[in-house]
Structure formats: structure tokens, C-alpha cells
Amino acid sequence: MLSKGTAGSDGSTAYAQGGVCAALAPTDSPQKHAHDTLLAGSHVNDPVVVDVVCQEGPELVLELAEFGAQFTRMSAYDDNASDEQFHLCTEGGHSQPRVVHAQDATGAEISRALLERVKSHPNITLHDRHAAVALVTSPDRSAVAGIDCLAFDDDEHSTTTLGKPVRFAAPCVCLATGGCGQIYPITTNPAGSTGDGVALATALGAVTDGMEFVQFHPTALAAPPPPGEKPTGRAFLVSEAVRGAGAKLVDANGDAVCRGGMGDLAPRDQVARDIYAAITRQMSDSPAAPQHVFLDAQAVEASGPKGKGGFALKFPTIDAELRRRGIDVSRGDLIPVAPACHYQCGGVCTDLDGRVLGTTSLRVTNMGRTRKSKQRRSRSRSAGRRASGEERAPERVLVHAHGPSSHHRHAQPIAGLFAAGECSSTGLHGANRLASNSLLEGLVFGKRAADAAKLHLKMVRAEGVDVGELALDAPWPFGFDVEACPGEVDVAKAVEESAMQVTAELQALMMSHCGIVRTTRGLLRAAEGVQELGIRLSEIRASGGAVASRVLALVECEFLHAYAREVVNAALHRRENRGLHYNVDHCGDQTEGLEVARSEVVS
């Protein structure tokens, strides 16, 4: 198991506050959960995937609790309640309370429980501070045979440190690299969220979809850090559960921000646009107006014992961070918030077994021996075979396009390559992710991908394929040179500085022209800018020679660039407003254009 940083703490999961969805309440059902998911996703989700996730989710959440995840129980708020009953929250877009949580630090608790299991497993080895840079394929490019990384020795590796090239031979690789929040200047994602998985997979010809659907969380904290601390670029998230508990969004005049039917609990895309509109109005009225709105959490505060202390009781992590920044809800302070890039609903396409899909020479094979499918199967049939436990060889599949009406009929699984979580596009989220469905998707597809990988591994072993030998014959990417070069530190520093400048320009470009509200003219400018920055990156790599390939800042910038290109192209091809994609030049009621923009093969 490889981690670019430190396993369990550096990924986005550890920062997830709200919770994980599971239809466990007596009044709830997987069907109701599926309905809410489809509604939030503007009905361009894959309904088969939605049903599978909502059906399988509750059992996996209960399994997490058996693993030792300490979820908050009803007894935490009611002395007469059972210790066995989960406390279920309501968040935006949900018609029922179904969010299982660990106070307001659910992701950290899930990471802790799973990491303990991983560390205690005799057959799992953790490799921290290993940044993936390229997938390894067999010489005939018929299957994945491993992964190339940059390894860093220091505990908190700096981008100025030259990485050591390391190759891991493996018949199966599962990408779980998270999203790409760093393509924007303000994000709730950690620094390592640079789109690695999408860039790695598309380099092999994987197809993407839904890339235009970038979710901006409506309520990132818009307060400066405490005195003496420098801004990090990662915005602190004020969980949606705060609004679910009764907090209200108000503008600088104290007027309600959200005026639609669902009010403050509308899906995130609508709330983010409502806040964007409120900030725009404030700025037009007065240039000195704040570039944020406020959360009034006094109703939450009053929900505590004796009518006070409710906010700190329910949201201790958020309360502690607010107090660090001089904001005290208990004394009536409002919480300044503004949208920040939070989640990518698109990614590399996968089937129901988490297999990455592509249209390249990486075919459905037995490590070099092509097995042609004798019949095309649907996803529902795949689910049926999974339920029966029948083992089968990989076959050609139909690929979802976030809607049952449009399939990419030429895509096939890339042998040995799997993906789960935010880097993938499973069809669950559609045009907008329902709150707290992200951890759930990771659970369901993480397990499904693992089960499929085990079958693939059995097939490889049955054929007697030596994956190590295949990986040994593959060339190193980017002209790696493991030998020390004269002046390499100075070269690396120059490459790093140039790459960081390109990253900053890319972030500004994306925020200006491909953010919450878009225009066709702006998207065209973004496309031109991305192309220009690509030329700059090629020049930087050429100037650094072999040393450049070992500079993490450059590799990450190239990943960011590849991801941004996918987002902009997808946004330009969508000629309607739907979910998270809102172009003011395409005003309408979202009745046309169900087809999702797909990537071209990147080689």
C-alpha cells in the first residue's frame, strides 16, 4: 500500500467531517436514499450504480463499526437512549436522517479504524512518502504490471527534495488517489490532492466523464488564521451538518441567503450559487463589503442542555478551530463562510467492479492473451453474477455515461487497473454529489474493486505469468536517471520554482474562468491558457533534463495541468446548465443535453 504522504492522515478522508450515509432509520430505506441521490445528481446518475451503493452501504457501515470505528450513538445526546443506536444526522439534499457520524470528525475516525486493521495484517506493507508518477505495463502493453514512484526519505518530505525512483511490480494496481482540489487557489482538500489517479490512468488511454462537475462546498471558513500562522491554501470546512442541525445562512445585512424550497438544506450546487450571488450583490453595493456570508448557529447553540452549549457539544472540532480564530458561537458570533473547491464528481470511468475503462491497446486480457467476450453483459447482470459468487474472466462491458441513454460502446476494462473513491467516476453522483455519499462510495467500490482484483490475481497466477519479469523489461518513464548529476540540487530548485509559478497561474486561471459560475468566453480563455501553460511545462521539463523527473513539484504540476485540461474540455462540451456546471450563456431549465462529455484518449 503506497501513500504519497502518511497513510491515514494526508488524504482527504481524514478531513471529512460530516459522515457516511446509510439508510438505517426505521423511516428510511435504500430506495429513499437512491431517490435523494438521483435528485441531487440532476438524474444523470447511473441508476443501477445508485441502487447498488444504497443497498450495499448499510452493511458496510455496520462492518466499519465492527472493525472498531467509534460512531456517535444516540446516548451521547439522550441519557435514555440505547448505546447501540447510531445518532443519525440530516444534511443538505436528504429527506431522512441517515448520516452516520463520529461527532464532526468522521473521516479521521474511519481512517484510524481502517489503518489499525491494515497495520495488523501480516500481508500488507505500508510505504509512506511514495509519490506515484507512472503506471508500468507489460512490454506488449496488454496489461498493467506495476507502478513507478518517487520515494522520499524524510518524515515531512519537501518538494525541494529529489525523489528516488522506485518500481513496484504488481499484477493489480488500484488507484485511490482522491481528487484535484489544488487546481483552484482555495480548496478544502489537502496539498497532495493533485489529480494523480486521473493523470496516471488517462496516460494509458482511460476515459473520463463528468469532469465538468466540480463541487464547491458552500461553507468553507472565511476567517484568517490566528496571528503568526501563514495561510496554507487549504480552507477549513464548516460541515453541512451544522446547517442540518439548524444553522442558517445570512448575508451582510442579516437577510436569508437561500430562498428556494429546501432553503439552507438544498443540494450543494444550489447553495453555493446562492452564496456566490449574495456575495456578488454585496460587492456591487459596496466594494468594501465582505467577500463572504455568515452562518448563524444560535439555534444549534440553544439546542444544548439548559439552552446553551449545543454547538460545542455537537461540533467540538469545528468549535475548537473557530475559537482558535477568535470566533465564539457561545457569545453570539456569526461564522464567516464562502464556497471552496471541495470534490470532483467526475473521474476515470469504472464498471461496477471498479475496473478502469479505456479505449487503448490495453485490452481485456489474460496478461497478453486476449479473451474476447462471447456476449455483452449489462451492469445488472454483472451485479447478479457478483451476488452468486460466480468467478468469471473480464469481459467487454457497457460504460455508464451518468445516464442510461448514452453508453461508450468501445470502452473496455484496462487489465489489472482498478480505481475507487474520488478519482473514479462510477456513475453514483451524476451532476452533483449528495452530501456524505463520498465516504459511502469509497466503501462500496473499495470492496468491489478488491474482490475483482482478487479474481484477476487468481487468473494471472493460473497462467504462471511472472509479473516481476514483465515490469523489469518496461522502460523507466520521463528519462529517469538514478545516478547523481553535478549541480542537480540547483537544477532541482530552479525546476521547482518554475513549476510552482505555473501551478499558481493555473489555479488563478481556473478560478477566474472555470469556477462556480462560468461563461463560454471564459471557458475558451481557460482552454487557451491551459494550452499555453502546457507549453511552459514542456520547456521546464526539457530545461531540467533527467533531474526534472525527480522533482515532485513538477510532476504534480503536470498532473494538475492534465486534470484541468479535462475539466475545461468537458465544460466546453456541455451546452446546458446541470448540477454543478452553470454557464450563464446557457440559461435554461436543464431539459437538454443528457450526454456527458467524454475525454479523448491521451497518449
Give the label of every model feature segment.
Residues 65-156, 160-164, 176, 221-224:
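Conserved redox-cofactor binding core of oxidoreductases
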Residues 160-172, 412-416:
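Core beta-strand elements of the Rossmann-like FAD/NAD(P) dinucleotide-binding domain
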Residues 5-38, 42, 219, 229:
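Conserved N-terminal glycine-rich FAD pyrophosphate-binding loop of Rossmann-like flavoproteins
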Residues 43-47, 84-112, 181-185, 294-301, ...:
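Helix-loop-beta segment of a Rossmann-like dinucleotide-binding subdomain
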Residues 172-229, 236, 435-448, 452:
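Glycine-rich loop(s) and the adjacent beta-strand/alpha-helix scaffold that form part
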Residues 200, 206-342, 398-399, 452-458:
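An anion/pyrophosphate-binding glycine-rich loop and adjacent beta-alpha core
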Residues 6-8, 15-21, 63, 69-97, ...:
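Glycine- and aromatic-enriched mobile tails/lids
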